[in-house]
């Protein structure tokens, strides 16, 4: 009798949860694109259309491409997405955006059925019980609303565990490699293969990972992957791919950033400014969770139940210290929780089972107060982090076992080495990181980033990212004013010449509008010649940006050039940053049509010629960062102005030819720059 009532209650709950998904979440997801799906879709569509995607991690560059395709989403960005993860959108990238999302939603909904079936097998729960756990996962609803990837990842990881339990090691390794290619964090699960000496699975993982990399590079090119490996991935691991001080992520990284790192706009009142504490505590606390999960993995073949528990502990530890998780990340939490619940049901341990379910609901609960607060009060605003830590502790308690002392010594030695390297690397990264804080110009709190500074009289014109898109912004001594544009079209670049202000207004096409005078159609990234009477600009032809001065085209697509930025000297000589055949960006002097003469300063972008014509400021790329450099046109001497572990780009000279404006993301998220004003010459 009790069993029938219990099953009836489960059926009722599943019916209610299914109605919520099908009757509320899916209709909302069906009507609009929402935040994340356009990012994946756009990347796949660009390469499908033959556009060079090398700059896809540049926020403003990608926004322009989004606008040109009439994608109804205020802001897009590819950071911190892996290029490979967008490849699955290739078959549907030829569809209109909302139709493509419909296809994606149908695929995700269909995947839930085999996922539930496989999860029943790996966890020991009934189909009904697994269905209830899936329905109780609020992050799953967010995954559907935003068109995210985590249902696919959940399916991959569940299938990989199913294969491990049945000793189908090559299949398990290959599936895990797919999971890593989609979202980096499952790479920690490969340590399970190492601890078990499951070399077949590890080799399959490495080979499949290599094949995924080859496939991705063949589609997107090496340049985009180089940017990901050298810039995006390191920032992601530090928790700085997006706003690192935002407590809504409820991560260890965001908590420690909030407590110990000062930033003038984003975190003006930390508990104390002690970045060295972040460099030490972040890896140390991560290791505190990860090391037991590794140490207590048995080094011999285990039962299917034991293997599943080991995976759940390792996956939970990984999810707990993921740097900047959004709510939908925890769709993957269904797998480890199902495994733990299945084990506790079999052991008839009701109290721990109730605790696990309560913690599972707490992790997914959308109503936690994560508002920004100052100082030590930040500890009160990361409740999801505490629920994850407790859930991981439960999983660790279930796998605790006695490992041989010799093996423990080796693992401890490896952990100590990894911790030392991480701390030293973190401290090195912080060297000089905050040096340009005294030179920062005040930003409005509504500005997520400010870029492309241009002096105009006593004020500075810049492009700012606001909640509804990009707007030209005027920054005075104590004031910030936004352009009175219609609010529909983005404003993505600008220049000043004489009394004129030229702004690139972007909709289905880019139009350079003058403060007075005619506009220029299909033109972007303007730069004025001396006197401001003639304009140089870029125009996209066959997926690459080409240089125009007035009505004359100075580069052609057949030559392989793809231009990024333009600078013009007082005597009207032109210096550009450009790539050829998807190579590294270099600086060139334009001598004629398709005649670009290399300036030998290494990999460089963002040229800016001083008003007196003596100096060329630019950014050079070294050790994964863009830093400022200076070249004397007379002596040809080149010197580095800055050497820091962040990006300082888009220099612009003041009229004294000694002071630079530039964009800096030091102490901020990758590419989310602020404006600095700094004198470099005596």
Language-model region placement:
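Sequence signature of WD/YWTD-type beta-propeller architectures
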Residues: 408-682
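Membrane-embedded alpha-helical segments of multi-pass membrane proteins
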Residues: 106-111, 151-156, 179-185, 206, ...
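Aromatic-enriched
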Residues: 339-430
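Primarily membrane-embedded glycan-assembly and transfer machineries that use lipid-linked glycans
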Residues: 1-171, 196-327
């Amino acid at each position: 009798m009790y069993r029938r009532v219990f099953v009836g209650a489960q059926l009722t709950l599943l019916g209610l949860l299914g109605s919520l998904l099908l009757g509320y979440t899916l209709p909302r997801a069906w009507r609009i694109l929402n935040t994340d799906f356009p990012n994946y879709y756009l990347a796949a569509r660009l390469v499908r259309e033959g556009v060079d995607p090398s700059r896809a991690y540049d926020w403003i560059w990608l926004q322009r491409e989004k606008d040109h395709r009439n994608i109804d989403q205020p802001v897009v960005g590819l950071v911190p997405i892996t290029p490979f993860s967008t490849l699955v959108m290739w078959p549907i990238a030829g569809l209109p955006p909302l139709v493509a999302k419909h296809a994606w939603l149908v695929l995700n909904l269909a995947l839930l059925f085999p996922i539930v079936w496989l999860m029943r097998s790996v966890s020991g729960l009934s189909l009904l019980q697994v269905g209830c756990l899936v329905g109780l996962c609020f992050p799953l609803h967010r995954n559907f609303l935003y068109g995210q990837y985590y249902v696919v990842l959940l399916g991959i990881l569940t299938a990989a565990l199913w294969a491990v339990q049945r000793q189908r090691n090559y299949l398990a390794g290959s599936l895990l490699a797919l999971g890593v290619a989609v979202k980096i964090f499952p790479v920690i699960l490969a340590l399970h293969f190492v601890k078990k000496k499951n070399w077949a699975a590890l080799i399959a993982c490495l080979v499949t990972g290599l094949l995924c990399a080859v496939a991705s590079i063949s589609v997107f090119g090496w340049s985009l992957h180089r940017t990901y490996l050298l810039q995006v991935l390191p920032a992601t691991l530090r928790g700085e791919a997006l706003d690192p001080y935002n407590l809504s992520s409820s991560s260890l990284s965001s908590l420690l950033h909030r407590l110990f790192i000062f930033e003038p706009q984003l975190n003006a009142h930390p508990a104390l400014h002690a970045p060295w504490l972040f460099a030490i505590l972040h890896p140390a606390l991560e290791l505190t969770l990860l090391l037991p999960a590794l140490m207590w993995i048995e080094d011999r073949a285990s039962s299917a139940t034991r293997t599943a528990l080991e995976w759940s502990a390792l996956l939970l530890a990984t999810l707990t210290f993921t740097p900047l998780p959004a709510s939908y990340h925890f769709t993957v939490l269904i797998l480890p929780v199902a495994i733990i619940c299945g084990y506790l049901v079999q052991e008839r341990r009701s109290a721990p089972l109730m605790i696990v379910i309560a913690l599972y609901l707490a992790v997914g609960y959308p109503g936690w107060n994560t508002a920004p607060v100052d100082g030590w009060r930040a500890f009160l605003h990361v409740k999801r982090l505490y629920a994850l830590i407790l859930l991981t502790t439960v999983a660790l308690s279930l796998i605790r076992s006695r490992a041989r002392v010799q093996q423990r010594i080796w693992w401890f030695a490896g952990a100590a080495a990894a911790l030392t390297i991480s701390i030293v690397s973190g401290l090195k990264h912080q060297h000089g990181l905050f040096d340009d804080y005294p030179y920062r110009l005040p930003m409005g709190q509504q500005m997520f980033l400010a870029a492309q500074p241009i002096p105009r009289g006593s004020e500075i014109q810049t492009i700012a990212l606001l909640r509804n898109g990009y707007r030209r912004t005027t920054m005075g001594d104590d004031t910030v004013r936004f352009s009175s544009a219609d609010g529909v079209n983005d404003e993505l670049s600008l220049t000043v010449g004489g009394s004129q202000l030229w702004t690139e207004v972007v909709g289905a096409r880019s139009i350079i509008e003058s403060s007075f005078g005619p506009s220029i159609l299909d033109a972007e990234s303007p730069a004025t010649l001396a006197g401001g009477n003639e304009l140089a600009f870029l125009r996209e032809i066959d997926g690459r940006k080409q240089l125009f001065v007035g009505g004359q085209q100075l580069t052609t697509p057949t030559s392989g050039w793809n231009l990024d930025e333009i600078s013009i000297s007082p005597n009207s000589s032109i210096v550009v940053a450009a790539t050829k055949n998807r190579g590294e960006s270099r600086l060139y002097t334009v001598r004629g049509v398709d005649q670009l003469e290399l300036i030998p300063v290494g990999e460089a972008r963002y040229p800016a010629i001083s008003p007196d014509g003596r100096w060329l400021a630019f950014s050079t790329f070294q050790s994964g960062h863009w830093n400022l450099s200076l070249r004397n046109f007379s002596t040809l001497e080149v010197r580095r102005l800055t050497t820091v572990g962040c990006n300082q780009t888009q220099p612009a000279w003041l009229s004294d030819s000694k002071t630079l404006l530039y964009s800096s993301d030091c102490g901020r998220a990758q590419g989310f720059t602020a404006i600095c004003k700094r004198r470099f010459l005596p």
